Amino acid sequence: MDSQRNLFLIAFLFVSFMIWQAWQTDNAPQPLQTQTTQNTTSAAGDAVNQGVPASGQGKTITVKTDVLSLNINTRGGDIDQAQLLTYPDKLGSDQPFLLLESTPGFLYQAQSGLTGRNGPDNPANGARPLYTSGQDHFELANGQGELRIPLTFTAENGVTYTKTFVLKRGEYAIGVDYQINNTTQQPLEVSMFGQLKQTIDLPKHRDTGSSNFALHTFRGAAYSSSETNYEKYKFDTIRDNENLSTTTNNGWVAMLQQYFATAWVPQTAGSNTLYTSNLGNGVAAIGYKSAPVIVAAGSQQQLAATLWVGPEIQDKMAAVAPHLDLTVDYGWLWFISQPLFKLLKFLHGFIGNWGFSIIVITFIVRGIMYPLTKAQYTSMAKMRMLQPKIQAMRERLGDDKQRMSQEMMALYKAEKVNPLGGCLPLVIQMPIFLALYYMLMGSVELRHAPFALWIHDLAAQDPYYILPILMGVTMFFIQKMSPTTVTDPMQQKIMTFMPVIFTVFFLWFPSGLVLYYIVSNLVTILQQQLIYRGLEKRGLHSRDKKKA
């Protein structure tokens, strides 16, 4: 049992270190810049409207659906602000979560337009197009399923550009459609682009304010192309002018943060160039630019894209574009976290409470692992039975480690005992534990999800540290109920303090994760008693003695 505990402590410390290291890799603090970064254009060239003077501010058009509140600037038709109406900014707040923002302290915009030789957003024009609209406010009415916001711009040559935003009830995917009416006698060449730009360094009002690593996930850019399903792109990489430039026939670009994302998905057939760019002043951009489209004289042409602005809801994102659901950051154990989440969501559909769903999933996992757990305790019981022989062997062979090792292996073989048999369930539990951690920290469905009593957010730490203390108590009982062969006083002290060490580690872990571990420990206590009864009948265990 002592080797099992030592392995468990080492494995847990290793997992904790890996969590910390993963956070450091993706979310290391970024130094504040005091001077403007040199503006380096990506290979996409004029796809980015960098440094183009506004030539006067446009009007703000407000748009409201049942889930979104947007501010659209008629200068370029960019979305300057987006609020998620069904997601509060903080637990207990009546303020909706602010995703896109255009203020002096922070910039996060979703831009789109038509560039290229004849595009109205071509930097050579000196200004973004100034659109007009028939009204300043659009709102989705009761019973209405779709809301359309048409913006119109007529160029000096008479060409009319209509930019229409299409929003649907309950949806975070926004259609952005362009209709080009070429009334001239000459063909036009345009390219559609979609771009996300954001201030790299977070101001205080955008920061979570958390000082512990357990509450951070990746914040930065990401993209998908024909060559790669999903690739992160750090803001620091863009700041260092190491820019992305790749051509693909499909894909998307995105900016990510914990629980929420924005993404541009091109919908027009043909190739697109995906790019990143350092826009200067501490602002990074990621976007796409379509291949040139020729609009014949006297004809019309339509171009389209989809903009995702909202929570990272996996099934809805997957319906918008292939692999867009991969933006949910489940870390390197995504292949375990995703099935766990699907099972958890399935259970929640019946139970209606995420906390009780976690309890049920714990019973399911431990039930599946019961044969391994039984084998683990049986192996440890056999190892305890061999302790007198092993101790006699140590006294007889002294410091001859090589011979000691050989005779011990021969003894294990003769007695049909696997010395590592007690470790397998622990090895299996560690990835499940870590995958559950990633699932809790990456699934927006668990953000602000209440359980019971004082636990109002399963994805956040217990504010009163009651669950971690209960977890430590269950570990203490497991330790006291488990036979041990430890005789060294120092090792005994270490074993005694293990529940305390684990309790301290769990203080800052998500409540849902601690809940899982408490229930898992309670199941361990129950299974332990059932298994020990069977071992007693086989003469492999005695309740009267704690030491073999």
From Swiss-Prot:
GO cellular component: a single term: plasma membrane
Entry coiled-coil feature ranges: none
A Gene Ontology biological process term: protein transport
Keyword match Repressor: no
Pfam families listed in its UniProt record: 60KD_IMP, YidC_periplas
Keyword terms: Cell inner membrane, Cell membrane, Chaperone, Membrane, Protein transport, Transmembrane, Transmembrane helix, Transport
Annotated compartments: Cell inner membrane
Ranges for region Disordered: 30-53
Molecular function terms from GO: membrane insertase activity
Entry's transmembrane regions: 6-26, 345-365, 420-440, 458-478, 499-519
InterPro entries (UniProt xref): Membr_insert_YidC (IPR019998), Membr_insert_YidC_N (IPR028053), YidC/ALB3/OXA1/COX18 (IPR001708), YidC/Oxa/ALB_C (IPR028055), YidC_ALB_C (IPR047196), YidC_periplasmic_sf (IPR038221)
Its membrane topology: Multi-pass membrane protein
Classification via NCBIfam families: PRK01318.1-1 (NF002351), PRK01318.1-3 (NF002352), yidC_nterm (TIGR03593), yidC_oxa1_cterm (TIGR03592)
Function: Required for the insertion and/or proper folding and/or complex formation of integral membrane proteins into the membrane. Involved in integration of membrane proteins that insert both dependently and independently of the Sec translocase complex, as well as at least some lipoproteins. Aids folding of multispanning membrane proteins.
Oligomeric and partner information: Interacts with the Sec translocase complex via SecD. Specifically interacts with transmembrane segments of nascent integral membrane proteins during membrane integration.
Similarity-based family: Belongs to the OXA1/ALB3/YidC family. Type 1 subfamily.
Protein name: Membrane protein insertase YidC
Species assigned in the record: Erwinia tasmaniensis (strain DSM 17950 / CFBP 7177 / CIP 109463 / NCPPB 4357 / Et1/99)
Encoding gene (name): yidC
